[in-house]
Swiss-Prot record:
The chain crosses the membrane at residues 4-24. Its EC number is 1.14.-.-. It comes from Rattus norvegicus (Rat). This is Cytochrome P450 20A1. Keywords: Heme, Iron, Membrane, Metal-binding, Monooxygenase, Oxidoreductase, Transmembrane, Transmembrane helix. It comes from the Eukaryota. Heme binds at residue 409. The gene is Cyp20a1. GO terms for cellular component: membrane. It is an enzyme of class 1 (oxidoreductase). It is found in: Membrane.
Amino acid sequence: MLDFAIFAVTFLLALVGAVLYLYPASRQASGIPGLTPTEEKDGNLPDIVNSGSLHEFLVNLHGRYGPVVSFWFGRRLVVSLGTADALKQHFNPNKTLDPFETMLKSLLGYRSGAGSGSEDHVRRRLYGDAVTAALQSNFPLLLKLSEELLDKWLSYPETQHIPLSQHMLGFALKFVTRMVLGDTFEGEQEVIRFQKIHGTVWSEIGKGFLDGSLDKNTTRKNQYQEALMQLEAILKKIIKERKGGDFSQHTFIDSLVQRNLNEQQILEDSVVFSLAGCIVTARLCTWAIHFLTTAEEVQKKLHKEVDHVLGKGPITSEKIEQLRYCQQVLCETVRTAKLTPVSAQLQDIEGKVGPFIIPKETLVLYALGVVLQDASTWPSPHKFDPDRFADEPVMKVFSSLGFSGTWECPELRFAYVVTTVLVSVLLKKLHLLAVDRQVFEMKYELVTSCREETWITVSERH
């Protein structure tokens, strides 16, 4: 069952993957409104490509046909749900699986851990616990790296334009690599080498598999495969060292080793977190700071809370829970940026949403980017308004989508903590300012980014 689920969600990343053609799928009419196939072989793939991204395709499709829609990928029926109410009705099929993690593992070709629902649940819990334990052990390092970035920005003249996305990626990479791998990656050159490998792998996850161009370009495909092998080789070496050594620093790999996972499971989880933990954190930090530069009153209110809770002391893991408005800011950042715009589940058994029957083994997309901009759920959806999350019913809806609470993915939970620490450290000493006349265009992939670099300036608080 898990193998089939992994195959199904691979679609989100490998839209032209020939694997789908290996599984005969029903062409029966589902009765769900939507598109008929544009082409017999590719279904509606040309429509997705012409839309620019899967998210933008779904925005148009739901706008045209309503909250429950259908289309065809190859010869396979796909159903997409585009409102919170539709998602609430459907949330049943495979809740032991983390769609984000599963999508990455399917793309990377990982199949270990495929077992019963209870086994999957245990594996997911162990993975989340390992992230939490490593983060707690490395909290002083997180604070140190945040303060180093603060000092760097303080050294700039007020007119200096800072490439925000670049700095946030570098910051996230430094912390994630050392939290996962230990002091092996303390040196700048090791981080730079890892960043190059990491960038090659992630860029193809976001682009090459999305538009099918990777399979058509032998050079790029070889570079991707070589980078993935290098990434795995680095991690295998570290895993072997951590198993046989006695280290003062507790890492993510140490947490996995202590939980008696086999070497392949440890490798898979380390690769997934090294990739996803870094990118989700970098993008959340980028978007949070970007929105703070464009919302002066929000920044003032957040600075006031940071000053009240922290005073002259440093931020601690205990004080993070007291930064309630900061939590609202980050939730609104995820919503406004549509940070992870699509996830998926496989329909294990025949299901129903409203009057519509969803056939067994249908791939069901959760059009989260559409849901997060639904005016019936979020008044003034395009406005950055953290105060909306002061209302408990709003927070419950957000949690039901998997962005907080029990079902949030470990990578996002990790990113919330890291971003809270960094933003708190920066706001204590700096005003964060936007650069005039920038045009922002979102790039929708597995994790949403800015299509071009985001520039900011800073000035010291007195």
